[in-house]
Every structure is written in structure tokens, then in C-alpha cells.
Amino acid sequence: MDNILGTLLNMNGKTKDNLEARQDLRKMNLRPKLHPFTAENNKTYLPAACFTMTKKEKTDFLQVLHDVRVPDGYSSNVSRCVKLKECTVGGLKSHDNHILMQQLLPIALRGTLSDKVVRPLMELSGFFRDICSKTLRVEDLDRLENRIPIILCQLEQIFPPGFFTIWCIWSYI
């Protein structure tokens, strides 16, 4: 969740879209439109990506999260973690991240970015919502297993490679 919020909101120290990520794209010869360039004033610039939010889009997105009200005990007050002036979200507890990912992110993203960006993120939210549901049928797991590679491929076409944190899961015998 940190990678998603940090990158969408371009939060300092949290975003996975930075100069190094863009230089990696250049080295891999991927997405030339996103390669950094140096202007006449010798400053390096990063072209806007499809997931780059404008100030208004950030404000609209965060306003939804700030204004959301949930029943007591459902989650902590997410609005306390939203900083509208700084356009950041921080201090979320683990359960709040789950609620944000599974329930609130799809609502907050509507109307902010293009369908190309929003749809895979909404599907990822749906994946986590389904996999964490109280009841799961084998057919549901089969559907989810078939769908997740497609979702990840769509996300790989949108976000830079550094966006994807690699987790090592060790099996204990």
C-alpha cells in the first residue's frame, strides 16, 4: 500500500517514481517517453507519467479519504492520517492499510486518473478483498489465480520496475 500511495501522491521518500527509476527505464530501453531529460538550464526533468496526479487530482483523492466515515470498530479514523495541505497519507496501522486497499482506494481513485491506471488498481483491490473474505470457494481461488498475473502485467505496463517490491517467502518444512 505504501508503494501505491507514495507513487500516486509523489510523496518524498515514498515514491517509486524517481530519477533512479527513470534512469533504469533508459538502461532497459523501456518507455522512452518517460526517460529523464536535461533542459538548457542544466536541470534534469522527469516527464509526467500516466499515473502522475495533478495537484487537483491529489486534493480530490485525499478529500475522499479525509471525508470518509466508517462504523465504530471497523477501522481507525483514516482521516487523521490524511494531510490535505501536504498531500500525504501517513501513520496508517496495518488494519487501516487493509481497509484502504480493499475498500477505500477504489472509491477515492474514481475520477482522478485515466481508466488505464485506475482499472488495474481497482482489480488489485478486488483481488485482496476476495482473498481476505470470510468464505472462499475453490472456484473463486481458481478465478483469482488466473486473474492476478493479468493484473500484475497491467500494473507493470504502468508503473516503473522499482514499484514492485520483491518479497521472499521461505517455506519451513
Language model region names:
Residues 1-173:
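A structural signal for the principal folded core domain
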